[in-house]
Amino acid sequence: MYDDIFNWLKEHGITEVECILPDITGVARGKIIPKDKFISEPDMRLPEAVLLQTVTGEYPQSSLLDETDADMELKPDQSTLRFVPWAQDPTASLIFDCFSPDGLPVETAPRNVLKRILKLYENMGLEPIVAPEMEFYLISPNPDPDVPLQPPIGRTGRSEFGRRSYAVDAVNEFDPLFEEIYDYCHEQNLEVDTLIHEIGAAQMEINFLHGNALDLADQVFLFKRTVRESAFHHKMYATFMAKPMEGEPGSAMHIHQSLNNVENGNNAFSSDDGTPSELFFHFIGGLQKYLPQTMPFFAPYVNSFRRLTRFTAAPTNVEWGYDNRTVGLRVPRAKAKGRRIENRLAGVDVNPYLAIACSLACGYLGIKEQLQPRAPLSSNAYSLPYQFPTTLEESIERLRQCEPIHEILGQRFVEMYIAVKEQEVSEYFRVISPWERKYLLLHV
């Protein structure tokens, strides 16, 4: 069954295998196993609770958790076999899928959530195509979380200051790092494309080539590890926080999405005459209706909401428009075969499997409900009222009330996701911030 994997490991002289799976926050969990042991026992077991840790490593207080902490059956996906280029010894990585002892997919596994949505589209004769854009900051090493972050020192010996958007020389400040990142990505078959300098100090963006939604989610999952590891090697940090620094723009994961007709390979967002199809408009209608109700998948942490402010290239609404970067749903200029919708809501701190799954789920509901979008906006959308929940707590409550999303993503999964988010909010509010000590200690 796994002969191709075993042969690849032997041919490449692999000594260790990283057996990994994404948890509900997008962290890589799993085991590192000697190659010979992996070949003798390629399947693996881990408790489901591994998937359900908060970002701090705690567990939610939920009756939905298995009291016996029973194991899942884990099976490697051969298509995810890759070389780990930064490892000291020859190492491979494999992403595993999660099954219950009776062989059914574990509904709380993020990869299975995305597969569930892709199956719905498959039943309609459609294949979702996505292309994520990943923004992130480079920062100087900072082991003390109470100290504000600073940009790293580049080749000129200076920290970046001011605004350097699209400046090629500003990217070249860190040329050895980016050469290594691209080399690492190439060795892992991560199909990265354009590199640009974003608005913030040492804020960068790397785009992916478009492709299958599950494959791209896997690539983003591995890309985050890759960039962080390369940054460590060059004595700096790379952060995928949505809003890491005060006074600087936040970082997003924009999701370009379209639907291909499986039968003929054509873009289902375009009619035969090249005009936008009804499916295209229904998809936008679904995003407009359901994105505000599913914010925890696109802004999963308290910090995420600091990004969603006016005039910072982040959306404050779910209006749509042609080539309009002030709206939440932008339709880039493209020929009929390249027609797509850019969901600009997601922060780069999201779990890529869940953000892509939920974005596609919202569009799917729009198609099923035959929803029509509001008229496209050609003016500045920042002048419009804020259309999202303003806090994580409010967004959790709106998700709790959204039954169509519970049904399409899986009732138990959504309830467990809410439990994890509520636990994280509780943990956050136990921490007294420097702002509180500064202004309240002696003034109230």
Predicted feature descriptions by range:
Residues 251-273:
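Acidic/histidine-rich catalytic neighborhood
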Residues 134, 198-206:
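Short, conserved phosphate-binding/catalytic loop or strand-edge motifs used
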